[in-house]
Regions:
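Conserved class I S-adenosyl-L-methionine
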Residues: 1-43
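Short helix-loop-beta connector
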Residues: 41-47, 105
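Class I SAM-dependent methyltransferase SAM/SAH-binding core
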Residues: 47-49, 55-101
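A short acidic, Gly/Pro-enriched loop at the edge of an enzyme's catalytic core
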Residues: 100-111
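A short beta-strand submotif of the Rossmann-like class I SAM-dependent methyltransferase core
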Residues: 114-115, 123
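A short, conserved alpha-helix within the catalytic core of class I
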Residues: 120-130
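Conserved Class I S-adenosyl-L-methionine
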Residues: 124, 180-254
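Conserved catalytic/acceptor-binding region of the Class I
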Residues: 131, 135-195
Length: 254
């Protein structure tokens, strides 16, 4: 994938990170799921579409509530991982499709979510598509969760990625997306939380980011990995990383 608005047009492919995503990126905290549930996301017998679902972490986190869930992603590798991880959930269906090419009936979904991904889409197409697919007074929610660079461990890892991949702009597209509203009457919420990691799981989390396996060539990645492991060897086996979670949601009237 290439996007002139992201990483100075540098190509990236989350399919290359699918196994790391499956193993290391399902780190969303219970507090997030509690907030999503309080908004009615995942409620029994509702119909919920998760855009850019990746390995399906968010749908799995609320699948027991009884919604009928469809997760879509452009990456076949990510969807393969999602299916493997979701075998026990008969109420989740996954499909490979660019969001811009989705075809569902009008007024089909009670809820549409876009977690860690809305800035990758073409809003000129996707905004109208959301309006078409969602039911009157349906809920559309965008989610962004990131480590905070004032956390010393996160700062060092982030700086190392930038050293090996100068085109990577980190979460800048997401920050801009937080300020951009395509629907009326946005409701915004956020909270900070310390998430637990081991040296292995933090290394895996960083490998899965857009700036590492998704876009580095093999030799660059090998040099990055060697340098990152050296940093991690100076840390205790277990530690926490400060994160911030941003929620923006809209009731879509028609």
């Amino acid at each position: 994938m290439e996007n002139v608005r992201i990483d100075n047009g540098q190509s990236f492919d989350f399919g290359k990170t699918a196994s790391e995503y499956a193993k290391y990126r399902d780190i969303y905290p219970k507090e997030l799921y509690d907030r999503l549930s309080a908004l009615g996301i995942g409620k029994a017998n509702s119909v919920w579409l998760d855009l850019g679902t990746g390995t399906g972490a968010i749908p799995r986190g609320l699948a027991d509530h009884g919604a009928n869930i469809i997760g879509v992603d452009i990456s076949s590798e990510q969807i393969e991982q999602a299916k493997n991880l979701s075998e026990e959930y008969k109420n989740i269906t996954y499909m490979v499709c660019p969001v811009e090419k989705l075809k569902f009936a009008d007024n089909f979904f009670d809820t549409i979510t876009a977690c860690q991904c809305f800035w990758y889409f073409n809003p000129k197409i996707v905004v109208d598509k959301i309006r078409q697919m969602i039911k009157p007074n349906g809920l559309f929610l965008k989610l962004y969760m990131s480590y905070l660079k004032d956390d010393p461990i996160a700062k060092e890892s982030h700086s190392l990625v930038k050293e090996f991949n100068p085109n990577w702009v980190g979460g800048s597209p997401a920050v801009q997306d937080l300020k951009t509203h395509y629907f009326d009457n946005p409701i915004m919420d956020s909270f900070t939380i310390d998430l637990p990691f081991t040296r292995e799981s933090w290394h895996g989390r960083i490998k899965a980011c857009r700036g590492v396996l998704a876009s580095m060539d093999t030799k660059t990645f090998e040099r990055f990995e060697e340098a990152h492991i050296k940093i991690l060897q100076q840390l205790p086996e277990q530690f926490t990383i400060k994160h911030k979670v941003f929620l923006t949601y809209y009731i879509i009237t028609k």
